[in-house]
Amino acid sequence: MENKKVRIFDTTLRDGQQCPGAGMSFEQNLEYTQLAMEVGVDVLEAGFPSASHLDFEIVNTIAKLYGCKENSPIIAGLCQLREEQIDTTIEALLPAVKFKKAMLHVYLPVGIHLMPASLGERADDKQGLIKDVYNFIKKAADAGMEVEYSPEGYSQMGENFDFVTDTIRAAVEAGAYVINCPDTTGGACSFQKNNYFVDDMKKHAAIIAKEYPGRDVIWSVHCHNDFGLATQNSINGVFQGPARQIEGCFNGVGERAGNVSLEQCIMIIKHFAKELDDKNPFYTTINTEKIAKISDYIAKNMLPRQPHFPITGYNATRHSSGGHTNAILRNPLAYQPFDPKEVGKEIGIVFGPLSGGNHARSIIERCGYVCTEEEKAEVAQHIKDLYSQRRKGITDDELIRGYLDYRAPIKIEAFDYSKTAQTSEVKLKGKFFTFKGDVREVHEGKDSALAALKKIIDKYFGPVEVQSHRSKSDTSGITAVSVSKITIADELGAVYEGSGADQDIEISAMKALVDAVNKAYIERNYRKKN
């Protein structure tokens, strides 16, 4: 039975970092290598050793540290078809050779526009180039390298088809194991019919299979995304062509519009390959649950990721619409094509203007509070009204603050107080437990207005003990605001802290006491019992 494993060739450290603004430090290259090993890529292209001393050092260090590990990927280095670059790349990869974990990836421009622009007069000496392909690849193969040959600009080769055929022959004859067929400029499209590069791959694969029977050659695709077709072209290379390796970058980073997104290809193969052949489908050996981790690393350290980016984008598994969230709360796959846990993510439900009562209730109950079927719509509307200017949605913590505001038994619209030598009086306007309107209380003694407020609270709620009271100004000057913290204990000994702020220190303390009592009341009456 044919082995239909599709190798994943990760060029994030090479092609990905060639994108302006995407470069990482030496240490970050090593950190990324560890993540690539955890996710299980088959080949990691660590860089272009001839580009600079630092690039050489990065590739060489990765080859030393990871080439010896049993579960590490093959470590690849890229070079042009130039002997000095071949030698430098071999030297950089030598630490991984004895573990059979070293790949030299060499390319030659063959596109009708690319070839003369890149090679100059050398482009006219096609026979000389074919000889160089053979000689330099043989040199690398004899040094113990696995060799990959890329005819750069393959999808735009046009009239160079026969020349490209000869270079592939020379590469295979010299010992190349992988023939990679790049859509270098991202201009390939299946509408090209007979000029489509996947059809050319099939022709070349047939020629090599006929001329080198029994030779194990892996065909590979390397697609750029300039027309947004990189994923389709890469998958076509596998599903409709001879490709058994996909080259690309996680998050689709890379030159210009980027390389193909590896995570998209991996998940498409996982979910759709069986539609072609359910008995022996194409597959990868990627640990998909680690995909989110490596994707997040790239988004943090290379280039930001679009929120709506497929598979790993921040919004790819988040929902807000009321109808959607209602369905997802019953069945996560109602509005998801796959379980986000497959790639190491969780479904997120963001409460926003279009969210409904079921959504609010699910968050409230998950946070340990009571929300009944009868009141869920009213609770949701209260929270929406409270955050009416937050059209992009609110966090779960903000939603809970809205819920607590809905439950609060004391809501004071206006505080007023007065003091004499022997009394303090407080006047409140608003909601005070079951009473709405004006509340007045006089306290005999030299205590502050806070004592009068506590006297009212003890009547309606039950006695509370003020255990601590701290007030301080947030700034200096006459416009400073007093910030108060008050800790209370109820009859059962439960402790709650409230906070308040006002330019009037007495009112800031009263606000803090109200906040603490509200918390105590809600915990006592609306906290779910285990």
Regions found by a protein language model. Give the residues of each.
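Alpha/beta enzyme core
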Residues: V6-I8, Q18-D42, V59-L65, E83-R215, ...
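Mixed-charge, glycine-accented linear interaction segment located at domain edges/termini
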Residues: A494-E497, A501-K529
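A glycine-rich helix N-cap at a beta->alpha junction
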Residues: C68-C79
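Catalytic alpha/beta core domains of metabolic enzymes, predominantly
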Residues: T185-L329, A334
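Active-site beta-loop-alpha junctions enriched in small/polar residues
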Residues: R14, P49-A51, L78-R82, Y107-G111, ...
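Non-catalytic terminal/interface segments that mediate subunit docking, oligomerization
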Residues: Q18, G23, N29-Y32, M37, ...
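A mid-to-C-terminal "edge-of-domain" accessory segment
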Residues: K5-V6, D10-T12, I269, A273-V439, ...
